[in-house]
Design a protein with these regions (language model features):
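Aromatic "clamp/platform" in nucleotide-sugar-dependent glycosyltransferases that forms part
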Residues: 517
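N-terminal subdomain of nucleotide-sugar transferases
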Residues: 237-242, 250-301, 472
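Conserved acidic donor-binding segment of nucleotide-sugar-dependent glycosyltransferases
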Residues: 549-558, 565-570
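Conserved donor-binding/catalytic core segment of Leloir-type glycosyltransferases
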Residues: 438-462, 468-473, 479
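Acceptor-binding helix/loop patch of EC 2.4 sugar-transfer enzymes
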Residues: 305-311, 362-398
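A short alpha->beta transition loop at the rim of the catalytic pocket in nucleotide-sugar-dependent
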Residues: 510, 532
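A short, active-site helix/loop in glycosyltransferases that binds the activated sugar's phosphate group
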Residues: 392-429
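Short hydrophobic beta-strand element within catalytic cores of glycosyltransferases
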Residues: 534-537
Protein backbone atom coordinates (compact mmCIF):
# COMPACT_ATOMS: atom_id res chain seq x y z
CA UNK A 1 0.00 0.00 0.00
CA UNK A 2 1.22 3.49 -0.82
CA UNK A 3 1.86 5.11 2.58
CA UNK A 4 2.37 8.50 0.94
CA UNK A 5 -1.06 8.39 -0.66
CA UNK A 6 -2.60 7.19 2.62
CA UNK A 7 -1.08 10.10 4.49
CA UNK A 8 -2.33 12.50 1.84
CA UNK A 9 -5.95 11.60 2.49
CA UNK A 10 -5.69 12.72 6.10
CA UNK A 11 -4.32 16.20 5.39
CA UNK A 12 -5.85 19.25 3.80
CA UNK A 13 -4.74 19.91 0.26
CA UNK A 14 -2.59 23.02 -0.28
CA UNK A 15 -4.39 25.86 -2.01
CA UNK A 16 -3.26 28.42 -4.57
CA UNK A 17 -3.85 31.14 -1.98
CA UNK A 18 -1.42 29.45 0.40
CA UNK A 19 1.12 29.15 -2.43
CA UNK A 20 0.79 32.88 -3.14
CA UNK A 21 1.23 33.76 0.53
CA UNK A 22 4.32 31.54 0.70
CA UNK A 23 5.83 33.21 -2.38
CA UNK A 24 5.25 36.69 -0.93
CA UNK A 25 6.83 35.71 2.38
CA UNK A 26 9.79 34.15 0.58
CA UNK A 27 10.48 37.26 -1.47
CA UNK A 28 10.19 39.44 1.60
CA UNK A 29 12.68 37.29 3.48
CA UNK A 30 15.01 37.32 0.46
CA UNK A 31 14.97 41.09 0.37
CA UNK A 32 15.62 41.26 4.11
CA UNK A 33 18.57 38.84 3.81
CA UNK A 34 20.02 40.86 0.92
CA UNK A 35 19.84 44.07 2.97
CA UNK A 36 21.45 42.46 5.99
CA UNK A 37 24.26 40.97 3.92
CA UNK A 38 24.89 44.29 2.21
CA UNK A 39 25.39 45.94 5.61
CA UNK A 40 27.60 43.15 6.98
CA UNK A 41 31.32 43.58 6.15
CA UNK A 42 31.96 40.00 7.26
CA UNK A 43 29.41 38.47 4.90
CA UNK A 44 30.43 35.38 2.92
CA UNK A 45 32.51 35.86 -0.20
CA UNK A 46 33.00 33.58 -3.17
CA UNK A 47 36.10 31.43 -2.74
CA UNK A 48 38.35 30.42 -5.65
CA UNK A 49 39.71 27.04 -6.58
CA UNK A 50 43.27 26.33 -5.49
CA UNK A 51 45.67 23.45 -4.93
CA UNK A 52 47.46 24.62 -1.80
CA UNK A 53 45.67 22.06 0.40
CA UNK A 54 45.27 19.33 -2.20
CA UNK A 55 47.60 17.03 -0.22
CA UNK A 56 46.36 18.06 3.23
CA UNK A 57 44.89 15.33 5.46
CA UNK A 58 41.20 14.58 5.12
CA UNK A 59 39.32 15.87 8.16
CA UNK A 60 35.94 14.45 7.17
CA UNK A 61 34.36 12.43 4.39
CA UNK A 62 30.76 11.85 3.40
CA UNK A 63 29.23 9.35 0.97
CA UNK A 64 25.58 8.96 -0.01
CA UNK A 65 23.61 7.23 -2.79
CA UNK A 66 22.17 9.34 -5.58
CA UNK A 67 19.27 7.05 -6.47
CA UNK A 68 16.51 6.35 -3.91
CA UNK A 69 15.70 2.72 -3.26
CA UNK A 70 12.12 2.98 -4.53
CA UNK A 71 12.11 5.55 -7.33
CA UNK A 72 8.89 6.04 -9.29
CA UNK A 73 10.02 9.02 -11.39
CA UNK A 74 13.62 8.71 -12.65
CA UNK A 75 13.32 11.98 -14.57
CA UNK A 76 13.17 13.92 -11.30
CA UNK A 77 16.31 12.12 -10.13
CA UNK A 78 17.92 13.04 -13.46
CA UNK A 79 16.96 16.65 -12.73
CA UNK A 80 18.52 16.41 -9.29
CA UNK A 81 21.72 15.06 -10.82
CA UNK A 82 21.81 17.98 -13.24
CA UNK A 83 21.40 20.40 -10.34
CA UNK A 84 24.15 18.72 -8.33
CA UNK A 85 26.35 18.74 -11.43
CA UNK A 86 25.97 22.50 -11.79
CA UNK A 87 26.60 23.14 -8.10
CA UNK A 88 29.71 20.96 -8.06
CA UNK A 89 31.30 23.21 -10.67
CA UNK A 90 31.27 26.03 -8.08
CA UNK A 91 32.20 23.93 -5.04
CA UNK A 92 34.73 21.27 -5.97
CA UNK A 93 38.30 22.32 -5.25
CA UNK A 94 37.63 25.62 -3.45
CA UNK A 95 39.85 26.61 -0.53
CA UNK A 96 38.68 28.85 2.31
CA UNK A 97 41.15 30.99 4.25
CA UNK A 98 41.31 30.95 8.09
CA UNK A 99 38.46 32.96 9.56
CA UNK A 100 36.77 33.51 6.19
CA UNK A 101 33.07 32.79 5.96
CA UNK A 102 31.60 30.28 3.56
CA UNK A 103 28.01 30.69 2.37
CA UNK A 104 26.31 27.99 0.32
CA UNK A 105 24.29 30.39 -1.83
CA UNK A 106 27.10 32.90 -2.24
CA UNK A 107 29.33 30.13 -3.59
CA UNK A 108 26.75 28.31 -5.72
CA UNK A 109 24.56 31.18 -6.86
CA UNK A 110 20.86 31.10 -7.52
CA UNK A 111 19.47 27.99 -9.21
CA UNK A 112 17.72 29.10 -12.42
CA UNK A 113 17.05 27.54 -15.80
CA UNK A 114 19.28 30.11 -17.46
CA UNK A 115 22.19 28.91 -15.33
CA UNK A 116 21.63 25.28 -16.33
CA UNK A 117 19.48 24.02 -13.46
CA UNK A 118 16.57 21.65 -14.01
CA UNK A 119 13.42 20.44 -12.26
CA UNK A 120 14.07 18.12 -9.32
CA UNK A 121 12.29 17.29 -6.08
CA UNK A 122 12.03 19.93 -3.38
CA UNK A 123 10.50 19.56 0.08
CA UNK A 124 8.17 22.53 0.57
CA UNK A 125 5.48 22.88 3.23
CA UNK A 126 5.26 19.13 3.75
CA UNK A 127 5.13 18.15 0.08
CA UNK A 128 7.79 16.87 -2.29
CA UNK A 129 7.17 19.07 -5.30
CA UNK A 130 8.93 19.45 -8.67
CA UNK A 131 10.96 22.67 -8.61
CA UNK A 132 13.93 24.25 -10.36
CA UNK A 133 17.03 23.39 -8.37
CA UNK A 134 15.34 20.58 -6.47
CA UNK A 135 17.72 18.09 -4.89
CA UNK A 136 20.43 20.53 -3.80
CA UNK A 137 19.63 19.67 -0.19
CA UNK A 138 21.47 16.37 -0.65
CA UNK A 139 24.58 18.49 -1.14
CA UNK A 140 23.86 20.84 1.77
CA UNK A 141 23.19 17.82 4.02
CA UNK A 142 26.55 16.33 3.06
CA UNK A 143 28.32 19.65 3.60
CA UNK A 144 26.78 20.18 7.05
CA UNK A 145 27.57 16.63 8.14
CA UNK A 146 31.16 16.93 6.91
CA UNK A 147 31.62 20.38 8.45
CA UNK A 148 30.64 19.19 11.91
CA UNK A 149 32.90 16.15 11.63
CA UNK A 150 35.82 18.31 10.46
CA UNK A 151 35.50 20.74 13.36
CA UNK A 152 34.24 23.72 11.36
CA UNK A 153 32.05 26.30 13.06
CA UNK A 154 28.46 26.27 11.81
CA UNK A 155 27.28 29.88 11.68
CA UNK A 156 23.89 29.18 10.16
CA UNK A 157 21.94 26.00 9.54
CA UNK A 158 18.25 25.18 9.13
CA UNK A 159 16.47 21.87 9.63
CA UNK A 160 14.03 20.52 7.08
CA UNK A 161 10.38 21.23 7.77
CA UNK A 162 9.55 17.52 7.51
CA UNK A 163 11.51 14.39 8.35
CA UNK A 164 11.59 11.85 5.54
CA UNK A 165 12.03 8.18 6.49
CA UNK A 166 15.68 7.14 6.15
CA UNK A 167 16.97 10.69 5.69
CA UNK A 168 19.68 12.49 7.66
CA UNK A 169 16.92 14.57 9.22
CA UNK A 170 16.02 11.58 11.40
CA UNK A 171 19.45 11.93 13.05
CA UNK A 172 19.35 15.74 13.09
CA UNK A 173 22.22 15.82 10.57
CA UNK A 174 20.40 17.67 7.80
CA UNK A 175 20.63 21.24 6.51
CA UNK A 176 18.04 22.62 4.14
CA UNK A 177 18.74 25.56 1.82
CA UNK A 178 16.31 27.82 -0.02
CA UNK A 179 17.46 30.86 -1.97
CA UNK A 180 18.69 32.99 -0.34
CA UNK A 181 17.37 33.33 3.18
CA UNK A 182 17.76 29.68 4.26
CA UNK A 183 21.52 29.30 3.99
CA UNK A 184 24.32 27.12 5.29
CA UNK A 185 27.23 29.21 6.54
CA UNK A 186 30.53 27.98 7.91
CA UNK A 187 33.91 29.23 9.07
CA UNK A 188 37.03 27.82 10.74
CA UNK A 189 40.18 29.15 12.44
CA UNK A 190 42.24 27.13 9.94
CA UNK A 191 42.30 27.00 6.16
CA UNK A 192 40.21 24.21 4.66
CA UNK A 193 39.53 22.72 1.26
CA UNK A 194 36.28 21.29 -0.11
CA UNK A 195 36.23 18.41 -2.60
CA UNK A 196 32.95 17.14 -4.01
CA UNK A 197 32.50 14.53 -6.72
CA UNK A 198 29.90 12.09 -7.91
CA UNK A 199 29.83 9.10 -10.17
CA UNK A 200 26.77 7.41 -11.63
CA UNK A 201 25.64 6.11 -8.23
CA UNK A 202 27.06 8.09 -5.33
CA UNK A 203 27.86 11.59 -4.07
CA UNK A 204 31.16 11.96 -2.20
CA UNK A 205 32.33 14.96 -0.19
CA UNK A 206 35.68 15.49 1.51
CA UNK A 207 37.02 18.34 3.66
CA UNK A 208 40.80 18.75 3.94
CA UNK A 209 42.87 20.98 6.18
CA UNK A 210 45.53 21.22 8.87
CA UNK A 211 43.59 21.42 12.10
CA UNK A 212 45.37 22.10 15.39
CA UNK A 213 46.33 18.74 16.89
CA UNK A 214 45.15 19.97 20.29
CA UNK A 215 41.72 20.80 18.95
CA UNK A 216 38.83 18.57 19.87
CA UNK A 217 38.02 15.99 17.20
CA UNK A 218 34.39 15.93 16.24
CA UNK A 219 32.98 12.51 15.46
CA UNK A 220 29.33 13.20 14.77
CA UNK A 221 27.36 12.72 17.96
CA UNK A 222 24.48 10.31 17.69
CA UNK A 223 21.37 12.43 18.16
CA UNK A 224 18.01 11.01 19.15
CA UNK A 225 16.01 10.14 16.09
CA UNK A 226 13.44 12.70 15.06
CA UNK A 227 10.17 11.00 14.17
CA UNK A 228 9.39 10.83 10.47
CA UNK A 229 6.47 12.97 9.35
CA UNK A 230 4.16 12.27 6.41
CA UNK A 231 5.20 14.05 3.22
CA UNK A 232 3.25 13.92 -0.01
CA UNK A 233 4.98 13.33 -3.36
CA UNK A 234 3.27 15.40 -6.06
CA UNK A 235 4.13 12.82 -8.67
CA UNK A 236 2.57 9.83 -6.96
CA UNK A 237 0.27 10.93 -4.13
CA UNK A 238 -2.86 10.43 -6.21
CA UNK A 239 -4.39 13.80 -5.22
CA UNK A 240 -5.28 14.84 -8.76
CA UNK A 241 -7.37 17.81 -7.63
CA UNK A 242 -4.35 19.45 -5.97
CA UNK A 243 -2.93 22.36 -7.99
CA UNK A 244 0.60 21.04 -7.39
CA UNK A 245 -0.06 17.56 -8.71
CA UNK A 246 1.92 16.80 -11.86
CA UNK A 247 1.78 13.03 -12.19
CA UNK A 248 4.82 11.01 -13.16
CA UNK A 249 7.08 12.44 -15.85
CA UNK A 250 6.56 11.17 -19.38
CA UNK A 251 10.23 11.34 -20.38
CA UNK A 252 12.58 8.37 -20.23
CA UNK A 253 16.28 7.99 -19.59
CA UNK A 254 18.34 7.22 -22.67
CA UNK A 255 21.81 6.68 -24.10
CA UNK A 256 23.77 9.13 -26.25
CA UNK A 257 26.40 7.96 -28.76
CA UNK A 258 29.06 10.38 -30.02
CA UNK A 259 31.08 8.65 -32.76
CA UNK A 260 33.81 11.23 -33.32
CA UNK A 261 36.18 8.61 -34.74
CA UNK A 262 34.27 6.39 -37.16
CA UNK A 263 36.21 3.16 -36.77
CA UNK A 264 34.38 0.20 -38.35
CA UNK A 265 34.62 -1.60 -35.00
CA UNK A 266 32.72 1.24 -33.30
CA UNK A 267 30.10 1.30 -36.05
CA UNK A 268 29.56 -2.44 -35.54
CA UNK A 269 29.15 -1.89 -31.80
CA UNK A 270 26.57 0.82 -32.51
CA UNK A 271 24.62 -1.45 -34.84
CA UNK A 272 24.58 -4.20 -32.21
CA UNK A 273 23.79 -2.06 -29.16
CA UNK A 274 21.67 0.85 -30.37
CA UNK A 275 18.40 1.24 -28.50
CA UNK A 276 15.12 2.59 -29.80
CA UNK A 277 15.38 5.87 -27.87
CA UNK A 278 19.14 6.34 -28.26
CA UNK A 279 20.48 9.56 -29.72
CA UNK A 280 23.38 9.08 -32.12
CA UNK A 281 25.76 11.70 -33.48
CA UNK A 282 28.05 10.68 -36.30
CA UNK A 283 27.78 7.94 -38.93
CA UNK A 284 24.32 6.44 -38.81
CA UNK A 285 22.89 9.34 -36.79
CA UNK A 286 22.71 13.11 -36.59
CA UNK A 287 25.25 15.47 -38.03
CA UNK A 288 27.88 16.84 -35.69
CA UNK A 289 27.47 20.57 -34.97
CA UNK A 290 31.00 21.06 -36.32
CA UNK A 291 29.85 19.73 -39.71
CA UNK A 292 27.68 22.79 -40.36
CA UNK A 293 29.09 24.73 -43.35
CA UNK A 294 29.86 27.85 -41.35
CA UNK A 295 31.65 25.79 -38.71
CA UNK A 296 33.75 24.04 -41.35
CA UNK A 297 34.80 27.41 -42.75
CA UNK A 298 35.56 28.77 -39.27
CA UNK A 299 37.63 25.71 -38.37
CA UNK A 300 39.62 25.97 -41.58
CA UNK A 301 40.37 29.64 -40.94
CA UNK A 302 41.25 28.95 -37.31
CA UNK A 303 43.58 26.15 -38.35
CA UNK A 304 45.37 28.31 -40.91
CA UNK A 305 45.56 31.29 -38.58
CA UNK A 306 47.00 29.19 -35.77
CA UNK A 307 49.66 27.73 -38.03
CA UNK A 308 50.44 31.18 -39.46
CA UNK A 309 50.94 32.51 -35.92
CA UNK A 310 53.43 29.72 -35.31
CA UNK A 311 51.32 27.60 -32.99
CA UNK A 312 52.45 24.00 -32.84
CA UNK A 313 50.25 21.48 -34.58
CA UNK A 314 49.29 19.69 -31.32
CA UNK A 315 48.11 23.01 -29.85
CA UNK A 316 45.89 23.68 -32.84
CA UNK A 317 44.54 20.15 -32.59
CA UNK A 318 43.78 20.56 -28.87
CA UNK A 319 41.85 23.76 -29.57
CA UNK A 320 39.69 21.86 -32.04
CA UNK A 321 39.08 19.06 -29.55
CA UNK A 322 37.99 21.60 -26.93
CA UNK A 323 35.48 22.98 -29.42
CA UNK A 324 34.16 19.48 -30.14
CA UNK A 325 33.83 18.82 -26.40
CA UNK A 326 31.79 22.01 -26.03
CA UNK A 327 29.59 20.81 -28.89
CA UNK A 328 28.97 17.52 -27.11
CA UNK A 329 28.24 19.25 -23.79
CA UNK A 330 25.79 21.53 -25.56
CA UNK A 331 23.85 18.52 -26.86
CA UNK A 332 23.60 16.77 -23.49
CA UNK A 333 20.16 16.79 -21.91
CA UNK A 334 19.30 15.82 -18.36
CA UNK A 335 17.93 12.40 -19.41
CA UNK A 336 21.22 11.54 -21.14
CA UNK A 337 22.67 9.61 -18.21
CA UNK A 338 24.28 6.84 -20.27
CA UNK A 339 26.96 7.97 -22.72
CA UNK A 340 29.28 6.42 -25.29
CA UNK A 341 32.13 8.90 -25.76
CA UNK A 342 35.33 9.22 -27.80
CA UNK A 343 38.56 9.10 -25.84
CA UNK A 344 39.81 12.31 -27.45
CA UNK A 345 37.12 14.45 -25.76
CA UNK A 346 37.25 12.76 -22.38
CA UNK A 347 39.66 15.08 -20.49
CA UNK A 348 37.77 18.22 -21.50
CA UNK A 349 34.38 16.81 -20.47
CA UNK A 350 35.84 15.61 -17.18
CA UNK A 351 37.43 18.98 -16.44
CA UNK A 352 34.15 20.78 -17.14
CA UNK A 353 32.18 18.46 -14.83
CA UNK A 354 29.88 17.13 -17.57
CA UNK A 355 30.49 13.47 -16.66
CA UNK A 356 29.52 13.78 -13.00
CA UNK A 357 26.50 11.63 -12.17
CA UNK A 358 26.60 9.90 -15.56
CA UNK A 359 27.55 6.39 -16.59
CA UNK A 360 29.75 6.30 -19.65
CA UNK A 361 31.72 4.01 -21.93
CA UNK A 362 34.85 5.22 -23.72
CA UNK A 363 35.68 4.45 -27.34
CA UNK A 364 39.42 3.92 -26.97
CA UNK A 365 41.40 4.98 -30.04
CA UNK A 366 44.81 5.12 -28.35
CA UNK A 367 46.68 4.24 -25.21
CA UNK A 368 46.01 6.58 -22.28
CA UNK A 369 48.26 9.61 -22.58
CA UNK A 370 50.27 8.80 -19.47
CA UNK A 371 51.06 5.31 -20.83
CA UNK A 372 51.75 6.65 -24.32
CA UNK A 373 54.30 9.10 -22.97
CA UNK A 374 55.95 6.36 -20.91
CA UNK A 375 56.38 4.32 -24.11
CA UNK A 376 57.88 7.28 -25.93
CA UNK A 377 60.19 7.99 -23.00
CA UNK A 378 61.47 4.41 -23.24
CA UNK A 379 62.13 4.97 -26.95
CA UNK A 380 63.96 8.22 -26.15
CA UNK A 381 66.25 6.39 -23.75
CA UNK A 382 67.19 4.02 -26.56
CA UNK A 383 67.47 6.74 -29.24
CA UNK A 384 68.26 10.00 -27.40
CA UNK A 385 69.44 11.65 -30.62
CA UNK A 386 66.04 11.35 -32.37
CA UNK A 387 64.03 14.54 -31.95
CA UNK A 388 60.75 13.16 -33.31
CA UNK A 389 60.40 10.92 -30.26
CA UNK A 390 60.04 14.06 -28.12
CA UNK A 391 57.23 15.55 -30.22
CA UNK A 392 54.20 14.32 -28.27
CA UNK A 393 54.28 15.70 -24.75
CA UNK A 394 50.88 16.73 -23.39
CA UNK A 395 50.12 19.09 -20.53
CA UNK A 396 50.29 17.35 -17.14
CA UNK A 397 46.82 18.57 -16.22
CA UNK A 398 45.36 17.17 -19.43
CA UNK A 399 47.03 13.81 -18.77
CA UNK A 400 45.68 13.71 -15.21
CA UNK A 401 42.16 14.65 -16.34
CA UNK A 402 42.11 11.89 -18.95
CA UNK A 403 43.38 9.30 -16.49
CA UNK A 404 40.82 10.22 -13.81
CA UNK A 405 38.03 10.11 -16.38
CA UNK A 406 39.19 6.70 -17.60
CA UNK A 407 39.27 5.37 -14.05
CA UNK A 408 35.70 6.55 -13.50
CA UNK A 409 34.42 5.07 -16.79
CA UNK A 410 32.21 2.02 -16.69
CA UNK A 411 33.86 0.35 -19.69
CA UNK A 412 36.63 0.86 -22.26
CA UNK A 413 35.57 -0.30 -25.73
CA UNK A 414 38.45 -1.27 -28.00
CA UNK A 415 39.72 -3.94 -30.39
CA UNK A 416 43.32 -3.15 -29.35
CA UNK A 417 44.74 -6.03 -27.27
CA UNK A 418 47.15 -3.78 -25.35
CA UNK A 419 44.41 -1.35 -24.38
CA UNK A 420 42.14 -4.20 -23.30
CA UNK A 421 44.91 -5.66 -21.14
CA UNK A 422 45.24 -2.31 -19.38
CA UNK A 423 41.47 -1.99 -18.97
CA UNK A 424 41.14 -5.24 -17.04
CA UNK A 425 37.54 -5.80 -15.96
CA UNK A 426 36.53 -2.51 -17.56
CA UNK A 427 37.49 -3.73 -21.01
CA UNK A 428 34.90 -4.60 -23.62
CA UNK A 429 36.63 -6.40 -26.46
CA UNK A 430 35.61 -5.50 -30.00
CA UNK A 431 36.76 -7.62 -32.93
CA UNK A 432 39.08 -6.01 -35.45
CA UNK A 433 37.34 -5.53 -38.80
CA UNK A 434 39.37 -7.66 -41.19
CA UNK A 435 39.90 -6.04 -44.61
CA UNK A 436 39.42 -7.88 -47.88
CA UNK A 437 42.51 -9.85 -48.84
CA UNK A 438 44.56 -8.61 -51.77
CA UNK A 439 44.11 -11.07 -54.68
CA UNK A 440 46.79 -13.72 -54.94
CA UNK A 441 46.84 -13.24 -58.70
CA UNK A 442 48.16 -9.70 -58.23
CA UNK A 443 51.00 -10.72 -55.93
CA UNK A 444 54.54 -10.28 -57.20
CA UNK A 445 56.61 -13.42 -57.57
CA UNK A 446 59.51 -14.03 -55.20
CA UNK A 447 62.68 -12.20 -56.17
CA UNK A 448 66.35 -12.89 -55.70
CA UNK A 449 66.28 -11.24 -52.28
CA UNK A 450 63.54 -10.90 -49.65
CA UNK A 451 61.20 -7.92 -49.79
CA UNK A 452 59.95 -6.66 -46.42
CA UNK A 453 57.08 -4.20 -46.23
CA UNK A 454 57.22 -1.67 -43.37
CA UNK A 455 53.51 -0.65 -43.14
CA UNK A 456 53.88 2.77 -41.49
CA UNK A 457 55.66 6.06 -41.95
CA UNK A 458 59.38 5.31 -41.41
CA UNK A 459 59.61 7.08 -38.06
CA UNK A 460 61.46 6.09 -34.91
CA UNK A 461 58.27 5.54 -32.91
CA UNK A 462 57.13 3.03 -35.53
CA UNK A 463 60.32 0.99 -35.14
CA UNK A 464 62.13 1.79 -38.39
CA UNK A 465 65.47 2.19 -36.58
CA UNK A 466 65.20 -1.26 -34.98
CA UNK A 467 64.31 -2.84 -38.33
CA UNK A 468 67.28 -1.24 -40.11
CA UNK A 469 69.61 -2.35 -37.34
CA UNK A 470 68.26 -5.91 -37.50
CA UNK A 471 68.82 -6.25 -41.29
CA UNK A 472 71.89 -4.02 -41.62
CA UNK A 473 74.13 -6.91 -42.73
CA UNK A 474 71.49 -8.59 -44.92
CA UNK A 475 70.75 -8.16 -48.60
CA UNK A 476 67.04 -7.32 -48.33
CA UNK A 477 64.74 -4.72 -49.83
CA UNK A 478 62.55 -2.70 -47.47
CA UNK A 479 59.37 -1.30 -49.00
CA UNK A 480 58.15 1.97 -47.50
CA UNK A 481 54.67 3.52 -47.96
CA UNK A 482 54.08 7.23 -48.62
CA UNK A 483 54.45 9.48 -45.58
CA UNK A 484 56.85 11.32 -43.30
CA UNK A 485 60.27 9.87 -42.64
CA UNK A 486 63.19 10.21 -40.27
CA UNK A 487 66.17 11.93 -41.86
CA UNK A 488 69.45 10.19 -42.58
CA UNK A 489 68.24 6.60 -42.41
CA UNK A 490 71.16 4.19 -42.85
CA UNK A 491 70.01 0.79 -44.17
CA UNK A 492 73.49 -0.74 -44.44
CA UNK A 493 73.45 -3.53 -47.04
CA UNK A 494 69.66 -3.33 -47.24
CA UNK A 495 67.96 -0.98 -49.68
CA UNK A 496 64.93 1.26 -49.21
CA UNK A 497 62.25 1.71 -51.85
CA UNK A 498 59.04 3.71 -51.77
CA UNK A 499 55.80 2.17 -53.03
CA UNK A 500 52.75 4.06 -54.23
CA UNK A 501 50.36 2.79 -51.56
CA UNK A 502 49.88 0.29 -48.76
CA UNK A 503 48.11 -2.01 -51.21
CA UNK A 504 51.10 -2.04 -53.55
CA UNK A 505 53.36 -2.77 -50.60
CA UNK A 506 51.30 -5.84 -49.68
CA UNK A 507 51.25 -7.03 -53.30
CA UNK A 508 55.04 -6.88 -53.59
CA UNK A 509 56.09 -8.04 -50.12
CA UNK A 510 57.32 -11.42 -48.95
CA UNK A 511 56.59 -10.44 -45.36
CA UNK A 512 55.42 -7.52 -43.24
CA UNK A 513 57.35 -6.13 -40.26
CA UNK A 514 56.30 -3.43 -37.78
CA UNK A 515 58.43 -3.35 -34.59
CA UNK A 516 56.58 -0.24 -33.38
CA UNK A 517 56.84 1.45 -30.01
CA UNK A 518 53.37 2.93 -30.59
CA UNK A 519 50.66 1.78 -33.01
CA UNK A 520 46.96 2.31 -32.44
CA UNK A 521 45.34 1.23 -35.74
CA UNK A 522 47.18 -1.73 -37.32
CA UNK A 523 45.06 -1.79 -40.48
CA UNK A 524 47.96 -2.71 -42.76
CA UNK A 525 48.95 -5.59 -40.49
CA UNK A 526 45.38 -6.88 -40.60
CA UNK A 527 45.51 -6.65 -44.39
CA UNK A 528 48.75 -8.65 -44.42
CA UNK A 529 47.24 -11.34 -42.19
CA UNK A 530 44.16 -11.49 -44.43
CA UNK A 531 46.48 -11.93 -47.43
CA UNK A 532 48.30 -14.79 -45.73
CA UNK A 533 51.63 -12.95 -45.42
CA UNK A 534 53.93 -13.62 -42.46
CA UNK A 535 53.73 -10.77 -39.96
CA UNK A 536 56.23 -9.72 -37.29
CA UNK A 537 55.03 -7.01 -34.89
CA UNK A 538 55.21 -5.80 -31.31
CA UNK A 539 52.41 -6.12 -28.73
CA UNK A 540 52.11 -2.33 -29.02
CA UNK A 541 50.34 -2.95 -32.35
CA UNK A 542 47.35 -4.42 -30.50
CA UNK A 543 46.90 -7.62 -32.48
CA UNK A 544 45.06 -10.39 -30.60
CA UNK A 545 46.69 -13.76 -29.94
CA UNK A 546 43.96 -15.45 -31.99
CA UNK A 547 45.47 -14.10 -35.24
CA UNK A 548 48.61 -15.57 -36.87
CA UNK A 549 51.55 -13.25 -36.20
CA UNK A 550 54.97 -13.37 -34.54
CA UNK A 551 55.49 -11.07 -31.53
CA UNK A 552 58.71 -9.26 -30.63
CA UNK A 553 59.25 -6.68 -27.92
CA UNK A 554 59.73 -3.03 -28.87
CA UNK A 555 63.43 -2.16 -28.96
CA UNK A 556 64.57 -5.81 -28.98
CA UNK A 557 66.78 -5.86 -32.09
CA UNK A 558 68.18 -9.32 -31.45
CA UNK A 559 64.70 -10.74 -30.93
CA UNK A 560 63.57 -9.09 -34.16
CA UNK A 561 66.54 -10.56 -36.01
CA UNK A 562 65.70 -14.06 -34.72
CA UNK A 563 62.04 -13.70 -35.70
CA UNK A 564 62.96 -12.64 -39.25
CA UNK A 565 65.43 -15.49 -39.56
CA UNK A 566 62.89 -18.04 -38.33
CA UNK A 567 60.36 -16.87 -40.92
CA UNK A 568 63.02 -16.67 -43.67
CA UNK A 569 62.37 -12.94 -44.03
CA UNK A 570 65.92 -11.68 -44.25
CA UNK A 571 67.05 -11.80 -40.64
Amino acid sequence: MNTVATAATTTDLPTRREALVFACKAWGLRALRALRDAADPGRPRRHPRANTLAQAPALAEFDSPLWPGEEVDPMLVAGKLQNLRQALKRLDGIEVAPGARFGFWKQVGRATRRRGYAIGRELREGCLIPAIGGGLCQLSNALYDGAVRAGLTVLERHRHSRVLPGSLAEQDRDATVFWNYLDLRLCAPFAWRLEVEMDAQRLRLRIRGHRDVDAVSWPMAVSPRRPATPSNDCGSCGQYECHRHTGPSTGRLRRLWWLQEAWPEFSAALAAGRGEDDRVFGPGGRRFPAQAPWRRAAQSLSWRYGRWRGRALPQVRLAQLRAHARDLAGQLQLQDLDLVLPQSLLPFLWRDGELAGRRYAVLMTALPMRVLQDELDAAVRRHPQVRSLRDFRADETLIADEWQALQAAETWWSPHARVLAMAGERGRALSWAMPAAVPASGRASAGARPRLFFPASPLARKGILELLEAVRDRDVEILLPPGDSERGLDPGRATLRRVDSYRHGLLQADGVVLPAWVEHQPRALLGAIAAGLPVVATPACGLPASLPWTPVEAGDVEGLRRALRTLSMGG
